[in-house]
Amino acid sequence: SKPVPQDEALVTYARRLNRTDAPLDFRQSAAVVAQRVLALEGWPGSTFEHRGVMIKVGAARGEDATSSGTPGRILSADRSGVRVACGQGVLVLLQLQRPGGKMLPVGEFLAGFPLAVGETLASAEMPAFVATAPFPRAPKA
């Protein structure tokens, strides 16, 4: 095979991941949040704060369903998943983990840590992973 020259105008830069990438922003579309959960699986993971506790998300999927709820509002919570309103669509949380616990299917998680319909989960800004210009380097210590 012959080398194919790349179009320099389409170059993107990726930065290193860190713990500040973990919090989720439910104001984004459900598809974007679900892709972020998948991208950050393992470390640093994806999290949201609820009642002062950081909950880690192990698996989620986006649904195109329309929701009239405020982004972050819990629409339903049962064994099939916790449905959370997003900026566009609905995010279904499938696996959750409390601090110091293990990752559980949502049905088992809800048995020990109920999430009530109507409660709102905290959103946090999700910084971009890629850019068209290089990211600034942190100063060396």
Model features per residue range: what roles?
Residues D21, F26-A141:
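An anion-binding loop in the catalytic cleft
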Residues S1-A14, N18-T20:
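Donor/substrate-binding cores of folate-linked one-carbon enzymes
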